[in-house]
């Protein structure tokens, strides 16, 4: 979502599961605008965003738009894959550019590492001198990874620890709030709430604060607003001469920050 001259713009995925049987793509990108965030007006821009030749028409989704100040244009990225077997590792992020948010030009691949079967929920933001590109990789690992670059043209560098959280912290995106970059995604639930069962399509919302380390890589931590949401409850004290105590918040056992090991 973007606000330009008091008008809000939202770009989203339009989906029709019956279209493939009619020879049409099941997914297209859509554009709507609003002056009050209540009443929205769809545009007819979907035709501009149809899957391009050579790309899978049924895996073309999750647009993300930023303002590219250096080139005086808007940049839209989305998740895609090449046409072919779904098991092939042809996932990529593709890009469009525009001067007015209405007329878009397809610019090809933005990041195409051929490491994953699909890129989902791509994100792009800048902290200091570094650009960061986040995707949720659709594979057996199903986790969020990121790359970093000092230019939107790349090269995109893979840090040693390139993931946020673990397996099945999924489909996250970020926003900036009061100078903080918050990453919000969901953690999948196991069938019948049994750890030995498969993941199911549902889960628990989880927010991380993303912060930049001195070397430019990213880390995550619990947002202060979450820490401050409730008072800790004493669970028990460890009977040793260091006097450590364990507290519980939201049914999770936490060690107070002043006792935590620092990286």
Provide a role label for each language-model segment:
Residues 1, 5-62, 66-121, 126-165, ...:
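Beta-rich carbohydrate-recognition and catalytic domains
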């Amino acid at each position: 979502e973007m606000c330009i001259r008091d008008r809000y713009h939202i770009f989203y995925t339009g989906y029709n599961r019956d279209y493939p049987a009619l020879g049409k793509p099941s997914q297209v990108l859509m554009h709507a605008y609003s002056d009050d965030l209540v009443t929205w007006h769809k545009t007819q821009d979907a035709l501009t965003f149809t899957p391009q030749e050579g790309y899978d028409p049924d895996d073309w989704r999750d647009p993300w738009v930023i303002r590219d100040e250096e080139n005086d244009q808007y940049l839209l990225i989305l998740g895609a894959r090449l046409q072919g077997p779904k098991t092939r590792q042809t996932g990529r992020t593709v890009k469009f550019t525009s001067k007015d948010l209405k007329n878009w030009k397809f610019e090809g691949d933005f990041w195409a590492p051929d490491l994953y079967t699909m890129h989902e929920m791509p994100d792009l933001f800048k902290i200091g001198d570094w650009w960061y590109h986040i995707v949720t990789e659709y594979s057996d690992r199903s986790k969020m990874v990121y790359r970093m670059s000092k230019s939107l043209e790349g090269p995109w560098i893979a840090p040693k620890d390139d993931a946020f959280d673990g397996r099945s912290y999924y489909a996250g995106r970020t926003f900036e709030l009061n100078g903080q970059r918050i990453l919000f995604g969901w953690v999948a639930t196991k069938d019948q709430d049994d750890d030995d069962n498969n993941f199911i399509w549902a889960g628990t919302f989880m927010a991380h604060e993303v912060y930049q380390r001195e070397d430019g890589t990213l880390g995550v931590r619990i947002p202060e607003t979450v820490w401050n949401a409730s008072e800790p409850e004493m669970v028990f004290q460890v009977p040793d001469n260091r006097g450590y105590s364990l507290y519980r918040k939201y049914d999770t056992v936490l060690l107070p920050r002043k006792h935590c090991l620092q990286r």
